[in-house]
């Protein structure tokens, strides 16, 4: 990796105010300096979460609704912990117990959520674009916790923060020169899309690897190098990010068999040796051990960053909630914030 401490040109000043977005619906809406701003805002929460006293009252009196229309464990738990550590009242709404199961439309749901006068709504939905639609119908900030095959912005942010910590880069640093290989179901993965957007914006060299049937046709237009040969994609990589096969989004037969997929695209200790000697391994979860990643790799004591990703996820989500609720809290400078989606 070269140029490990590239300064963040055009970054907001220390304690900067003007984060111009009311909502966070995707990485695609953010400029490079805005991504860096959120990463840097998360640093204070990384430190707080490592203390015995992990809570603050910054969001005291505010209500956050986690509206999850798609099953989730780690993302929902991460957002719930983030909100509670900031002092907010957090309410979780699960699709299985919601009126959506009874035929309520998404617009009706949005109107209902808006009438509850929440101060922020976190949404996860199986349909691409659903989060943006709800954001257009409510009066409070909306955070995208994953929508269909579109985006998962906080996952990309936590992944970038994890990489920055693993490479021992200080606050304000981008990822210029970092070589990142992402392997798995690129076609159906919102995590891949959001990571590609954030990593290329931060200066990383991104390679994506997948079987031909799981590689988007237009992927090179996103500024990445596509591979179908995993061994070739690993050469020189500093970070190897594995993605699971998203069987729930597949309508046909995309791979011959799990066994054949593991043979060609599974990350084993032998295959990891083709990357840089000190390369790190990441996975957004949930993992399919023995298919896209071996347990010996996933659980490696020094090279696996998987549990650190979970740790950084809480800090990133605390940062996003704190920044997007400044308007509701009348934090100094809030007038300059929340102007656009």
Curated annotation (Swiss-Prot):
Any one Pfam family match given in the protein's UniProt record, by short name: OTCace_N
Enzyme class: transferase
Reaction(s) this enzyme catalyzes, per UniProt: carbamoyl phosphate + L-aspartate = N-carbamoyl-L-aspartate + phosphate + H(+)
InterPro entries (alphabetical): Asp/Orn_carbamoyltranf_P-bd, Asp/Orn_carbamoylTrfase, Asp/Orn_carbamoylTrfase_sf, Asp_carbamoyltransf, Asp_carbamoyltransf_Asp/Orn-bd
Keyword Ribonucleoprotein: no
Job description of the protein: Catalyzes the condensation of carbamoyl phosphate and aspartate to form carbamoyl aspartate and inorganic phosphate, the committed step in the de novo pyrimidine nucleotide biosynthesis pathway.
Name of the protein: Aspartate carbamoyltransferase catalytic subunit
Gene behind this protein: pyrB
């Amino acid at each position: 990796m070269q140029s490990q401490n590239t300064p963040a040109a055009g970054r907001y000043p220390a304690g900067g105010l003007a984060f111009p977005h009311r909502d966070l619906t995707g990485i695609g809406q953010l400029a490079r300096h805005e991504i860096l701003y959120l990463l840097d805002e998360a640093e204070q929460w990384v430190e707080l979460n490592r203390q015995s006293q992990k809570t603050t009252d910054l969001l005291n009196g505010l209500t956050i609704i986690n509206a999850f229309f798609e099953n989730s464990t780690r993302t929902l738990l991460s957002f719930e912990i983030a909100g509670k550590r900031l002092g907010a009242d957090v309410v979780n709404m699960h699709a299985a117990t919601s009126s959506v199961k009874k035929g309520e439309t998404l617009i009706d749901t949005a109107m209902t959520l808006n009438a509850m006068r929440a101060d922020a709504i976190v949404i996860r939905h199986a349909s691409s674009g659903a989060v943006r639609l709800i954001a257009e119908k409510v009066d409070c900030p909306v955070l995208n916790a994953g929508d269909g095959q579109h985006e998962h912005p906080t996952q990309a942010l936590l992944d970038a923060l994890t990489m920055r910590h693993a490479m021992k880069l200080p606050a304000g640093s981008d990822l210029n020169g970092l070589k990142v290989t992402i392997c798995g179901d690129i076609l159906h993965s919102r995590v891949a899309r959001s990571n590609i957007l954030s990593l290329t914006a931060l200066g990383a060299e991104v390679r994506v690897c997948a079987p031909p049937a799981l590689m988007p046709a237009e992927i090179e237009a996103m500024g990445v190098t596509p591979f179908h040969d995993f061994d070739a994609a690993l050469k020189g990589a500093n970070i190897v990010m594995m993605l699971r096969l998203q069987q729930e989004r597949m309508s046909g037969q995309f791979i011959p068999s799990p066994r054949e997929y593991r043979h060609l695209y599974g990350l084993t200790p032998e295959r990891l040796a083709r990357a840089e000697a000190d390369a790190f391994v990441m996975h957004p979860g949930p993992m399919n051990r023995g298919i896209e990643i071996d347990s010996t790799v996933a659980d490696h004591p020094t090279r696996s960053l998987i549990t650190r990703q979970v740790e950084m996820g809480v800090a990133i989500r605390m940062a996003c909630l704190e920044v997007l609720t400044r308007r509701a809290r009348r934090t100094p400078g809030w007038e300059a914030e929340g102007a656009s989606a």
